[in-house]
């Protein structure tokens, strides 16, 4: 009888799929991954299909994915994505919807370190900062700002398109709708090449642009221009975080959606069909054992293209077969160090005189990318940032785990070191083509968009796109998919 149970479940699912027709909504939807992408797409899917649809969210680790915290000395600190741009409209909406609050900002000065001395130092005076940029680099910073603003102005069109229900089956189609061939070409040309064409100097690229890209992606100005522009936009705008931790957005959305969170590793997705209608069998394993279930719609909201085989998800029964092995990811190690900064390494023998809370680096030194004096996720009204001579919690971002000798280079002494290792972003340039959101009729790959650019808001944009794509495909509203000249269409719909 136990052996018959899976067969009965399969038969029931197939009969339900055969009976479904016309305007009937899907019965069950599976989402693989409970990071910001998976949490957001569960919310958007329920928003479009209605509350009666059962949504199962599979997560092998902790809800939140790359939004995570680490406890240091009885306080929690961000160990994953630390902040969001002010123009992150979906994230702003989530925070309002969930009744969360922006974390109180604690101001700190930044600088770019070149291994022997600081290349650029921020002051407390805005006009003096502008003068220093002009004195060292001419009008390169203005040309950079104009270039980034032009890209962002076009990218912001996606919110209007999504508000009108339009979706895209591939990353290239989405980019073309926003910036035509310019955006598509920006995924094939480097940041450095694109900035040189608009008059930004090589020195400014080496000293400033490279430091920002290392801080965001751990990569150089040889990375594609589109991803670079999105990163540089984050460096120019005002940033914010969620009080209590950014991961609260993920858990809050899943709770709001009443999604069924299944703590398990999805091992395969197998295609079945009845009367021409696709049905997907999702197999998974957890501490109890192996099992599977059937779904009308499946969304993969976790990276498939990891070259270290950490993603063991396979696809069966698809013709042609689904390619899931191209591309590599950039490893990033975040170390939270509770200790005393070695200010002498940065040219300040007296730690009381060290003025910076955030340090970016150029290509040298190579063993770390950024060093930040960070604040806990809960900031009281009386909170103050630690003085440079005091023991503080520092966040060190590096391409590899830090050796003890490297820690001793950065810190005079320390009480504790806790690390989080991430496959943080795609290694841009390691994949020859842009992937597609639609892998099959109702099988979608949300993380496809991070091969164009990678950020929390980009994942939220991808989540909305996939939810709309699934909805439009389910109800055969093909006029809402991969449409050209959307700016004109949207204007005529107003």
UniProtKB/Swiss-Prot annotation:
Pfam families attached to this UniProt entry = NAD_binding_8 (PF13450), Prenylcys_lyase (PF07156)
**Function description:** Likely to have oxidoreductase activity. Required in the mevalonate pathway to regulate prenylation and enhances the bactericidal activity of neutrophils.
GO BP terms, alphabetized: neutrophil-mediated killing of bacterium; prenylated protein catabolic process; prenylcysteine catabolic process
Annotated protein name in UniProt: Prenylcysteine oxidase 1-like
Record lineage: Eukaryota, Metazoa, Chordata, Craniata, Vertebrata
Broad EC category: oxidoreductase
Q: Which gene encodes it?
A: PCYOX1L
The residues that carry sugar chains are 342
Q: Tell me the superkingdom of the source.
A: Eukaryota
Names of the cofactor(s) = FAD
Q: Tell me the first and last residues of the signal peptide.
A: 1-22
- Mind listing the UniProt keywords for this protein, alphabetically? FAD, Flavoprotein, Glycoprotein, Oxidoreductase, Secreted, Signal
UniProt-annotated location(s): Secreted
Primary place of residence? secreted
Q: Which family does it belong to?
A: Belongs to the prenylcysteine oxidase family.
From the UniProt record, which GO molecular function terms apply?
prenylcysteine oxidase activity
Q: What is its EC number?
A: 1.8.3.-
**Any one GO CC term of the record:** membrane
């Amino acid at each position: 009888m136990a052996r018959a149970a899976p067969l009965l479940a399969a038969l029931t699912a197939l009969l339900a799929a055969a009976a479904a027709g016309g305007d009937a909504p899907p019965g069950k939807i599976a989402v693989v991954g409970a990071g910001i992408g998976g949490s957001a797409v569960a919310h958007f899917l329920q928003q479009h299909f209605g509350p009666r649809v059962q949504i199962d969210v599979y997560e092998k680790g902790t809800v939140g994915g790359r939004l995570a915290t680490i406890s240091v000395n009885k306080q929690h600190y961000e160990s994953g994505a630390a902040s969001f741009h002010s123009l992150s409209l979906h994230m702003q909406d989530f925070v309002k919807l969930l009744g969360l609050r922006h974390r109180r900002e604690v101001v700190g000065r930044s600088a770019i370190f070149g291994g022997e001395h600081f290349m650029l130092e921020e002051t407390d005076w805005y006009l003096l900062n502008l003068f220093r940029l002009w004195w060292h680099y001419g009008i390169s910073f203005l040309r950079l700002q104009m270039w980034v603003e032009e890209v962002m102005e076009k990218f912001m069109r996606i919110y209007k398109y999504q508000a009108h229900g339009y979706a895209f089956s591939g990353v290239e189609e989405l980019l073309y709708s926003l910036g035509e061939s310019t955006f598509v070409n920006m995924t094939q040309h480097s940041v450095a090449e694109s900035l040189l064409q608009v008059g930004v100097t090589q020195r400014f690229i080496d000293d400033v642009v490279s430091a920002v890209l290392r801080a965001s992606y751990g990569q150089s100005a040889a990375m594609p221009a589109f991803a670079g522009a999105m990163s540089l936009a984050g460096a120019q705008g005002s940033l914010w975080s969620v009080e209590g931790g950014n991961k609260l957005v993920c858990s809050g959305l899943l709770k709001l959606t009443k999604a069924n969170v299944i703590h398990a590793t999805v091992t395969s997705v197998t295609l079945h069909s009845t009367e021409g209608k696709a049905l997907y069998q999702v197999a998974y394993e957890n501490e109890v054992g192996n099992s599977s279930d059937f779904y009308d719609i499946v969304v993969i909201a976790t990276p498939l293209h990891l070259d270290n085989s950490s993603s063991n998800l396979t696809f069966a029964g698809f013709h042609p077969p689904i390619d899931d092995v191209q591309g590599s990811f950039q490893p990033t190690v975040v170390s939270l160090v509770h200790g005393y900064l070695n200010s002498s390494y940065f040219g300040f023998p007296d730690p009381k005189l060290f003025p910076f809370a955030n340090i970016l680096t150029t290509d040298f030194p190579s063993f770390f990318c950024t060093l930040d004096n960070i604040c806990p996720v809960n900031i009281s009204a009386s909170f103050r940032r630690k003085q440079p001579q005091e023991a503080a919690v520092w966040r060190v971002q590096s391409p590899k785990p830090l050796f003890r000798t490297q820690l001793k280079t950065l810190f005079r002494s320390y009480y504790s070191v806790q690390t989080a290792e991430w496959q943080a972003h795609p290694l841009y340039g390691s994949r020859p083509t842009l992937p597609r959101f639609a892998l099959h009729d109702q099988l979608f790959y949300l993380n496809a968009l991070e091969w164009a650019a990678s950020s929390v808001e980009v994942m939220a944009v991808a989540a909305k796109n996939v939810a709309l794509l699934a909805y439009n495909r389910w109800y055969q509203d093909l006029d809402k998919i991969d449409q050209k000249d959307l700016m004109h269409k949207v204007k005529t719909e107003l």
